Amino acid sequence: MKRGGYRQINKALNISAFENYLDIQHDHLPKLNDVEQLSPRVLRVLGQNAGKFTLQGTNTYIVGTGRERLIIDTGQGIPEWTDLISSTLRDSAITLSHVLLTHWHGDHTGGVPDLIRLYPHLSNSIFKHSSSNGQQPIIDGQVFHVEGATVRAMHSPGHSHDHMCFILEEENAMFTGDNVLGHGTSAVELLGIWMASLRLMQSSGCRVGYPAHGAVIADLLAKIAGELDQKARREARVVRTLARNKREEQSKGRSKGSMTVQELVTAMHGKGLDDQVRTMALEPFINEVLGKLAGDGCVAFEVRRGEKRWFIVNDVTSSP
């Protein structure tokens, strides 16, 4: 199992994306065509793996304007995608020169064996950061050229340790992978690193986002700003809750005012929570926030009677 394996990812999907996915039920997502020319240089082919966390399915992108083009991501290995990509390439007289993978998760890499089976010349042209199994490495800043398209790689960990975005220079656009989705928010392995990657993506100035899931992002900079603001507000709420508890406990002669994650969730969201919402979504998400805040030096924990209890290091807020 690779670092941040599927157990963690599936758990994380329930964590940081949970509130957003409740608001964006799958049935209410806009319909995307199986194959759609999004711009003169970008052709999207849906992965045929629609689901709660894959949205309309994994977007695979054929990039370029000439006969020879590259593809970004390969879907989940669904036979219907294999048939669709094969017929699309055949009908458009397109051949593939490179396969670029945004990261290692199976809904992005699962189609690689089928591509190699159909097009054996690609066996030495599969590119991924932290490469394995005969793949070629991608270096931060590496540039891939095909007719009509210059694609520059940007290492952007957070959703996964090996996550890459790709900038399409001719369009001032970015293939955002799973760091930024077309709908809702992404699951992350390390919240602080993901937020730093979003700031890096923001600094590129790319206006349009081609996400790995969901519709085209017309204003990528605004979407990223909204993601960062949302996470900052959630962090601030955790800090306020810990600070308030510390003041209340200090008034009773208890110095740290530490709380378990369960107590923190109850203080923030009340006692009437559904058990599954609490254990599968809110508690793991708050754990991720606390981990980031600990890395920032804002909070720490103590272990009492076998329980990890969190407390604020400095009461930085006087909010009630």
UniProtKB/Swiss-Prot annotation:
Q: Which UniProt keywords apply?
A: Hydrolase, Metal-binding, Zinc
Q: What is its EC number?
A: 3.1.2.-
Q: Where is the active site?
A: 107 (proton donor/acceptor)
Return the cofactor note field. Binds 2 Zn(2+) ions per subunit.
CDD domains on file = LACTB2-like_MBL-fold
Q: Which reaction does it catalyse?
A: atrochrysone carboxyl-[ACP] + H2O = atrochrysone carboxylate + holo-[ACP] + H(+)
Work out whether the entry's keyword set contains Hydrolase. Answer: yes
- Record pathway: Secondary metabolite biosynthesis
Would you kindly state one Gene Ontology biological process term found in this protein's UniProt entry? secondary metabolite biosynthetic process
Its needed co-factors are: Zn(2+)
Q: Which residues bind Zn(2+) 2?
A: 107-108
A Gene Ontology molecular function term for this protein is:
hydrolase activity
Q: Where does Zn(2+) 1 bind?
A: 103, 105
Pfam families for the chain = Lactamase_B
EC class, as a word, reads hydrolase
| PANTHER family hit by this protein | ATROCHRYSONE CARBOXYL ACP THIOESTERASE, ENDORIBONUCLEASE LACTB2
Role this protein plays? Atrochrysone carboxyl ACP thioesterase; part of the gene cluster that mediates the biosynthesis of geodin, an intermediate in the biosynthesis of other natural products. The pathway begins with the synthesis of atrochrysone thioester by the polyketide synthase (PKS) gedC. The atrochrysone carboxyl ACP thioesterase gedB then breaks the thioester bond and releases the atrochrysone carboxylic acid from gedC. The atrochrysone carboxylic acid is then converted to atrochrysone which is further transformed into emodinanthrone.
Q: Which family does it belong to?
A: Belongs to the metallo-beta-lactamase superfamily.
Q: What is this protein called?
A: Atrochrysone carboxyl ACP thioesterase
Q: Which organism is it from?
A: Aspergillus terreus (strain NIH 2624 / FGSC A1156)
Q: Which gene encodes it?
A: gedB
